[in-house]
Amino acid sequence: VMVGFVFYKKNSTHSDYVLGGRGMNVWVTSLSAQASDMSGWLLMGLPGTAYLLGSGATNAIWTAIGLALGTYFNWLIVAKPLRKYTQIAGNSITIPDFLQNRFHSKSNVLRIFSALFILIFFTVYTSSMFAAGANLFDYVFGIGYIPALILSVVVVTAYTFLGGFKAVCWTDLFQGLLMFAAIIVVPCFMYKGLTSNTFEWSEIGKITLGVSEGFGAMGIVSAIAWGLGYFGQPHILTRFM
């Protein structure tokens, strides 16, 4: 919330509020893009899938491979052209604006439909992220799911409305560094715990990346296909703009 107040006074134009005036540091922008993408699903959803499902570990590994490829090609193919053409196409500061200006639409149909699609599907996506945060707070602090959900919604909404794009990117930066540290530290603790437990090591040894019963070639293709989502996620594409 304090970050929101800090950047509230630094936003002087509509472009500053919505897109940070296109002047965000490259490290802040890139880490923000990855942190906003690798949100609750990376630290809670994907490990949970790997733990609960029979072929979950194999599924999670192939999904991670697909997402890594999707992230790489999204930055390689989309990032620079999108930044360039959003400026050329009427200095567009939102995805709906860019689509309308890029294709020289005389009506607002393209803008309205793209905005509606983003609103509908991102409401579902955002709700799942709030649910993940609420579950985490409830588990760590024991305050109950509903109070944790309300707290998450209030805090995120407050700094977003106050500071706009800059506040979101800087909070994403801190969260991204925290997530990166967790990804490094947690496996180290897991390894330390597993060294004295042969049962878990034997179970890990059963994980295979090949075609197996319950997880065939179609499952592998479906898992890798998750990476295709990167090319159309507006919260990531906005960072490129």
Where are these regions (language model features)?
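Membrane-interface "cap" regions at the ends of multi-pass membrane proteins
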Residues: 1-45, 160-163, 176, 182-188
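Helix-loop-helix module between adjacent transmembrane segments
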Residues: 62-160, 222-229, 238
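Short, hydrophobic/aromatic alpha-helical segments in well-folded domains
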Residues: 46, 136, 153-154, 164, ...
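Hydrophobic alpha-helical segments and their helix-loop junctions in multi-pass secondary transporters
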Residues: 2-11, 79, 126-130, 134, ...
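Membrane-interface helix-loop-helix modules in multi-pass membrane proteins
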Residues: 18-91, 215-230, 236-241
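Hydrophobic alpha-helical segments of secondary membrane carriers
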Residues: 20-21, 31-34, 114-120, 171
